[in-house]
């Protein structure tokens, strides 16, 4: 589950924004940082040694997006650290968080300059579960701002996001609801946004799998509309319309 904070309600909102600015500005020695990271991973006891060895030997042979989307522990560890605000993990993975952010930023710049339709607004989708507590916070913040405190994977395919993620999330846990986020992205307005996004289909470990658009960490959206989705299987399915700020 992606961590979310709400402006005006959640003190975590401003704290996470300041944290993002801080760790993106730090410049570490990459060689030293990678060594410290793999040493840290070996102490955890629940990470496959072969995966650690591969990162140690081959990290520079692949892009950060390739590592992030691959069948390794990078994805789960970095998002667990950001979700739980685990300072240990964030510090050990600071080099990777910066590399991934910079890779998304560079792709965003390239795609905006070469895509002839880049000025046209478009929609992306994300299905996930949300605790009832956070859903109530979201309803209180309608018209305000919310932040996704992790790197954010979205899809251009609405049905994929609804059928594979949002509906199952509504059915699995009675203490949560299933959410289909519908995000409107206006590239012209996004020039002032501090959070880049990019189409990563060609960069992903699994190419062309789900028409994925990846946003950097701590992306801020405005909550425009919250409405119930009529569904034959559950009454705990909601659509939330967002606009990237």
Question: Where are the regions that the model predicts?
Answer:
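Mono-ADP-ribosyltransferase
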Residues: 1-245
